[in-house]
């Protein structure tokens, strides 16, 4: 037995339900906001967001999948060009449902469902700008470091010879300092034992 779709039934059969959702999605993408019942808006939200996700991918296979659901080529073109670019930096949450009260004739609860096309948030825009600036600075530093690295290589080739001459002198100085440091460490320890 086929499993029924999640969410409330929209009346009619499953084919009528699919066509109704496709038409609501096409109207939403064409007009950017539509007024409908709360139940239809709640069923439309995941459907429309899934289509926007396909549009963000932007490849031919995704376009053909959306064209299989929405037959209006003009709406699909607008979805893949305008809407996908507007929500490029947004990870989900492409639609917003706002309840507007009940309908006058049959007292059905109504809602406005609209596309969220404004930028994600000012803070995230600033963070994105800062990260891009940091990348540019890092690239500049790498470019400046490349000539400096060549001169460092020449200096490091000469440095081992100088270090080899300095090494015996440093070892002799360390051996002289080591016993003096041990004696200095033993004196405070002995004083602490006497104080107890």
From Swiss-Prot:
Compositional bias annotation for Basic and acidic residues: 134-143, 184-196
GO molecular function, one term: structural constituent of ribosome
Keywords: Ribonucleoprotein, Ribosomal protein
InterPro entries: Ribosomal_bL17 (IPR000456), Ribosomal_bL17_CS (IPR047859), Ribosomal_bL17_sf (IPR036373)
The organism's place on the tree of life at top rank: Bacteria
Biased composition (Acidic residues): 152-164
GO cellular component: cytosolic large ribosomal subunit
Gene Ontology BP term (one): translation
Short name of one Pfam family: Ribosomal_L17
Region annotation Disordered: where it falls in the sequence: 133-196
Family: Belongs to the bacterial ribosomal protein bL17 family.
PANTHER family: LARGE RIBOSOMAL SUBUNIT PROTEIN BL17M (PTHR14413:SF16), RIBOSOMAL PROTEIN L17 (PTHR14413)
Subunit structure: Part of the 50S ribosomal subunit. Contacts protein L32.
Entry protein name: Large ribosomal subunit protein bL17
Gene: rplQ
């Amino acid at each position: 037995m086929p499993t029924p779709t999640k969410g409330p039934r929209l009346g009619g059969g499953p084919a009528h339900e699919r066509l109704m959702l496709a038409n609501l999605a096409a109207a939403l993408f064409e007009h950017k906001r539509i007024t409908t019942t709360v139940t239809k808006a709640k069923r439309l939200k995941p459907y429309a967001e899934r289509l926007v996700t396909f549009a963000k991918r932007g490849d031919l296979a995704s376009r053909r999948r959306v064209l299989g659901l929405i037959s209006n080529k003009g709406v699909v073109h607008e979805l893949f060009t305008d809407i996908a670019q507007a929500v490029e930096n947004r990870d989900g949450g492409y639609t917003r449902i706002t309840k507007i009260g009940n309908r006058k004739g049959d007292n059905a609860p109504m809602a406005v469902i609209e596309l969220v096309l404004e930028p994600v948030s000012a803070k995230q825009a600033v963070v994105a700008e800062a990260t891009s600036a940091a990348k540019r600075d890092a690239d500049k530093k790498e470019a400046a470091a490349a000539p400096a690295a060549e001169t460092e290589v020449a200096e490091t080739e000469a440095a081992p010879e100088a270090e080899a001459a300095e090494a015996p002198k440093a070892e002799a100085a360390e051996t002289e300092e080591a016993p003096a440091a041990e004696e200095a460490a033993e004196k405070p320890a002995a004083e602490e034992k006497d104080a107890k």
